[in-house]
Amino acid sequence: MLRALGRLDGSTALTLSMHSHQVMVAEWKRRVQGAPTEGLLRKVAQDGLRIVSSGGSDWLPGSGRAEKVEGGYRVYDRKVFASGAPDGDVMNTSAIYIDPEKGPTVLHFPLPMNDPAVAVLANWDTLGMRGTGSQDVEIDGAFVADAAIAASRTPGKWHPLFHLISMLAFPLVYSVYAGIADGAREVALGLARRRPQDVIGTLAVGDLENTHAVMDLGHKAMVEVGAQAMPSADTTHRIMTLRNIVGSSAMAVGSKALDVAGGAGFYRAKGLEQRFRDLQGARFHPLRDREQQLYAGRMALGEEVDL
């Protein structure tokens, strides 16, 4: 569904993927681990609860500050790339608490978006994905009760939660980019078929088709791993390798689609310009290319994978 939606509207598809992967994680925990997440799932299904995430920008290091107070914590931070923030109901986020015994500790918790200490800033003015509403979210002393802390971990270290997120979230997120690339290919071929092609033009179409095939095969493999594997360092390795393949191939499809379309593709009304811009978002999700290559190299050498 996300790939099909991405063909038509990348921003809507990406925002939906950011909500959907959190629902999918909760459902996986309920089904596989017997975790008590049914209440959350019912709120999503029955009440239309919309979930925002700051996980991509926080990632393993975490960010923000949590100060211990009676009964919980006061949290301070500015979260970026919070897709769907203007219409979200709750944000799954984190902050770093300096534990006097354990040292820096990342705390994970849900935070209501209507909390008076939470503000969605009007600063989403970007190259692409302009319709995602991924504004910064300012958190200025929001109270988080002890009971609301869902998990804690050491900053910068791979935690089982992140292997699970990698396995489930990234096939969804990169379905969006595969869909945008599908749409770019279709537009380019439609424009190319309107005029006679010389050998150079036909070769450009063949090059586009080969690149799209690499992306398509990578995406199908990514979805298969996410559906059949169990979270682990090796599963994350496979998912992130495929994330690199799908993301780079999707961006290449966008570029080659412009070559195939010719000058007509330069006009915004043709639909390639926005797709090209939206595809650039594929480079910014973790693990970014060099981080993925480092992870892959460490896995191959049998070294510690922590970044």
Language model regions located:
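Buried hydrophobic positions in well-ordered alpha/beta secondary-structure cores of metabolic enzymes
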Residues: 1, 75-77, 139, 181, ...
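Glycine-rich flavin
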Residues: 1-87
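DPxDG-like acidic metal-binding loop motif
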Residues: 78-115
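Glycine-rich beta->alpha junctions and the first turn(s) of the following alpha-helix
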Residues: 126-213
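Generic structural signal for well-ordered, non-transmembrane alpha-helical segments
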Residues: 179, 206-213, 240, 244-251, ...
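Amphipathic, well-ordered alpha-helical segments in soluble domains
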Residues: 180-187, 218-221, 249
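C-terminal helix-coil-helix/basic helical segment that borders enzyme active sites and/or dimer interfaces
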Residues: 193, 214-245, 255-266
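Glycine-rich phosphate/cofactor-binding loops in nucleotide/flavin-utilizing enzymes
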Residues: 264-307
